[in-house]
């Protein structure tokens, strides 16, 4: 089956991705690598979920994530570095892939930021 997992680079999402891949499924991971958590941790989560070495040379967020997208792409896995609030990007993903199951795990974390930026959390 083809799974789309939002938030697939987070703690819970990356573990789900790992199990889905082990069970032979195709996984599309959509994650925006929000700054609440260190993006380097999410890169390591992603690498572990696709059974790749976590030895990764970090430079800067944008280039590191682009490198991760290319490095992890396979016949069973693809990572999209995008925000689920970007309707056009999501529409393109749905257009390009036959998705059987969507697992929505993406969420903005943190109580304090939710008070400071409530609209971001509502969207």
Predicted features by range, described:
Residues 1-123:
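N-terminal Rossmann-like NAD(P)+-binding domain of SDR-like oxidoreductases, especially those catalyzing
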């Amino acid at each position: 089956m083809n799974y789309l997992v939002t938030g697939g680079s987070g703690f819970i999402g990356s573990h789900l991705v790992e199990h889905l891949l082990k069970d032979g499924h195709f996984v599309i991971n959509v994650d925006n690598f929000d700054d609440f958590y260190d993006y380097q941790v999410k890169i390591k989560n992603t690498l572990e979920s696709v059974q790749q070495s976590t030895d990764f040379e970090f430079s800067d967020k944008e280039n590191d994530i682009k490198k991760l997208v290319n490095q992890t792409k396979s016949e069973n896995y693809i990572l999209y570095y995008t925000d689920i609030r970007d309707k056009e990007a999501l529409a393109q993903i749905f257009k390009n892939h036959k998705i059987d199951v969507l697992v929505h795990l993406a969420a903005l974390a943190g109580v304090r930021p939710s008070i400071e930026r409530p609209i971001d959390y509502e969207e």
